[in-house]
Each structure stands twice: as C-alpha cells, then as structure tokens.
Amino acid sequence: MKMRPEEISSIIMKQIEQYNQEVQVVNFGTVFQVGDGIARIYGLEKVMAGELLEFEDGTIGIALNLEAKNVGAVLMGDGLKIKEGSKVRATGKVAQIAVGEGYLGRVVDSLARPIDGKGDIASDDTRLIESPAPGIISRRSVHEPLQTGLIAVDAMIPIGRGQRELIIGDRQTGKTAIAIDTILNQKGKNVICVYVAIGQKASSVAQVVNTLRERGALDYTVIVTANADSAATLQYLAPYTGATIAEYFMYTNRHTLVIYDDLSKQAQAYREMSLLLRRPPGREAYPGDVFYLHSRLLERAAKLNDALGSGSMTALPIVETQEGDVSAYIPTNVISITDGQIFLSADIFNSGVRPAINVGISVSRVGSAAQPKAMKQVAGSLKLQLAQFEELRAFSQFASDLDQATQNQLARGARLVEILKQAQNSPLGLAEQVASIYAGNNGYFDNLQVLQVRPFLIGLRQLLATKYSKYGEIVASAQTLTPEAETILKQAITEYLDEFGAKK
C-alpha cells in the first residue's frame, strides 16, 4: 500500500486543529496514618470540607478535618488495604446519591446501594446527601393530619404532615413498634415512607422488612440501613440518605414519612469519628456541633407551600434514654429541635399498658391544628380525664374510704386506659377510634368489668364494619361526627351491649 504525502499532511493538519490544550489538574495526597476508620493525609492542599476522596484500593473517604499540615478523613469502609504512603485523590465532589421511583420497596445502604439481592435500582436523578432545609417562605403551617392508627397518639398527641415528633423512651418499651404501626397505617393514603435503621442488628431490620412485606406496606416504603457492624461513617450518613430519598418525593408533590431509628446511635457514631479525629470533646464526650448534627437533619422535614407543590416530609426521630433520663444531652437536644415528643415509660409497659405512652409528659406542639374535627369532638377532654385519673389513683393508694364520686371517676379512668390499649401491628381507622372513645366518654362501659372492655370493643368494631357500615362512610367523608353518624353509633353500641350481655 502506497501512502501519498498530501494524505499524511491532511491527517496531521486535522489532528493539529482538533488538539485541545487542556491541563487537567489532579489533586493528590499521601496517607501518613490510617486506622480505626480514620486516615490522615498530607499533600492535599486544595480540598473542600466534606469532599469525597478516593484511595488507591477504591475506598471512598470524606474530608472532615482541614488542618494546617494535614487532612483528617473518615472512611466509608474498613480500609484494610490502605497503607502508609498510599496515594489519595481529591474527586472535587461532595457526597450525593441517586434517587427515583425505583427505590420503593427496596432495602439500601447509607450510599443508596441496594443490599436486598434484587439487582440494581433505576434512578431518575441525583441529590446531595447534605441539602439545605426549605426556607421560611417555602413552608406553610402544619394543617393536614397524619394518622398513626394508634388511639393514644391520634387522640391526645396528634401528628400533622410536615411535623417532627420525637419518640423517646428506654430500650424495649415499644418505640419501633409505634413507628412500624404508623407505616402500616399509611396504606392507601398516598404517603411514601422511609425507614432508616441506624446501628441495629441485621436480624431486627430483617424482622421489620418481613412485617412490612407480609402486610403489603413494603410497596410504598424504602428501607435505609447501616447495621451495627457498619463503619461509623456509614451510621453517621444513613439518616441524611433517608432524608434525601424522602426529599425527592416531597419535591415531586408527594407526602412522605421518615423514621430515624434511632438518632442516639447516630450521635454515638459521630462522637466516635470526632474523638478519633481528635476534635475537642464536650458534654458526655460529644463534640460541640452534635446539636447541629441533628438540627440540620430534622429541619429538612417540612410542609411545602402551594407554589412548591404542597408536598410534605414528616419526621419521627427515635431517641433511646437510659433509665428514663430525658435530661441527658442527646434527648434534650432533640426535644428542643422537634415539635413535640411521645414519651414511652418502662413502668407503664411492664404494667401491661401498650403502647406504653406516658400521657403526662408527652405533647404535640403543632399537631392539634391538623387533628380531624371528629377526633376533636370526642377526645377534647380525654387527656385531662386521664391526668386526673392518674392523680386520683396515686392518692387512693393511701386513702381507706373514698366517696362515690371519686370511686366513679377511678372506675371510668380504668376503662379509658383499656380503650387506649392496642395490639401491635393493628392500626385503627379514624371512625373506629372515634367510636371507641365516644363509648368510653359517654359511660357505656361503666357497667362492664374492666377486662370486658377490649373484647366488647373488638365486637363493636365488627358490628360497625358490617351492619352499620354507613357510620364509617360518613366519618371518613365528612371527617366529623355528624348528628346522623352519632345516632347510628349510639344505636350500634346499645344493640351490641344487649348482645354482649346475652353472650355473658
């Protein structure tokens, strides 16, 4: 084959024209210390706080400490192959994850990578893990209810869409159970749920996944998990990943519910990272910015205004206390950030009242504006009645003879407590809750034994669902207890009282 000189010259000219003299600057550093999930690097002169770093073995780290002579980075992995002298490259990016509709029904890790063995997830978009919270003008006040399906919560500590309500209590008092019941109750209500498990046993997370799958709730739920054996960095990032996934749905005009289970473990992971990075310790050895750790996460929960599509993100953070001490550092921090708290007591739990909510110190600061009118009609005085009952019960232990009015009040209170008892994974609709409280408030249980109240309520709900289904339809559509609905309810209660008496 003979080459012509003009052909060669034209190829050379074309190459010269297409040549782009672009200098690509890559910022490299060298590891001089590594261990305990922390690496110290020198030579990385142009690096941002929070920037992702790539190590020789493919491990990703986050630059957290920018010091005069070196950079302190936390590793998203075990980093066992990183050695002293290894090269590190600054990527110029901050942590971001893929988001999209494909995440529904999936279990992912702190970097939104699937870990359920169902293959890759198709994503529509990416979002920064650390996004700014919506501003004041972007929000509107909480005004729509988010029903948990638990009578005690929906009646006395109501939650609205866009609210942040803390669930706080000792270990094994039913905190996760309340959160899971709330997810189950969102079925058919167009609410997308994100459950974030931080520092939990893999078996506990598997149990939650199975419960949601069996009850058809996994279809509208995303589970983000950083198990107890995960690196502290991944446990620290997991809640932000959950919030980012929920934000995607919130900004596409949907309602979302995020559960952080639990933030005590995230704070402990952050404390571990900070101490290893030699940041100065503060109260309980937590770093000085641990309040900011939680405030910037929980402030992302919001009810957006109409111009932004009216989406919402409701947050239910969980915090574990030691011996019921709510005055410890992390509990007081999160209480001050949130819009109320549901306090669970070990003593109440052990006495057989479940959910074990201590009504006296539980509060919802903004939820009453979102409570359905039907619930307000029947539950207005419920909290006061229960508080008076608790006071009288404590006093009656020392008094030998009580007058008839006090005895009646104690009897009514004991029956109201029975109404609030509820089995796990069995949330109730608004109409069923209203019927239960209405019957208790109006003395229909006064002639029943305390232990007969719950069997009676189960039978009454079945009767209302079958023979008197119009009652449920009216309450569901009008959201109020109309005179017609009240008449039907009275008729059903009276009829079932006779039937229940005959059964005895």
UniProtKB/Swiss-Prot annotation:
One Gene Ontology term of the molecular function aspect: ADP binding
Keywords: ATP synthesis, ATP-binding, CF(1), Chloroplast, Hydrogen ion transport, Ion transport, Membrane, Nucleotide-binding, Plastid, Thylakoid, Translocase, Transport
Recorded GO CC terms: chloroplast thylakoid membrane; proton-transporting ATP synthase complex
SUPFAM superfamilies: C-terminal domain of alpha and beta subunits of F1 ATP synthase, N-terminal domain of alpha and beta subunits of F1 ATP synthase, P-loop containing nucleoside triphosphate hydrolases
Entry annotated with the keyword Chloroplast: yes
Main localisation: plastid
Membrane topology qualifier: Peripheral membrane protein
Cell compartments where the protein resides: Plastid, Chloroplast thylakoid membrane
EC numbers, comma separated: 7.1.2.2
Binding site for ATP: G169, D170, R171, Q172, T173, G174, K175, T176
Keyword Protein biosynthesis among UniProt keywords: no
HAMAP family named among the record's database cross-references: ATP_synth_alpha_bact
Family the UniProt entry places it in: Belongs to the ATPase alpha/beta chains family.
Complexes and interactors: F-type ATPases have 2 components, CF(1) - the catalytic core - and CF(0) - the membrane proton channel. CF(1) has five subunits: alpha(3), beta(3), gamma(1), delta(1), epsilon(1). CF(0) has four main subunits: a, b, b' and c.
Protein name: ATP synthase subunit alpha, chloroplastic
Organism lineage: Eukaryota, Viridiplantae, Chlorophyta, core chlorophytes, Chlorophyceae
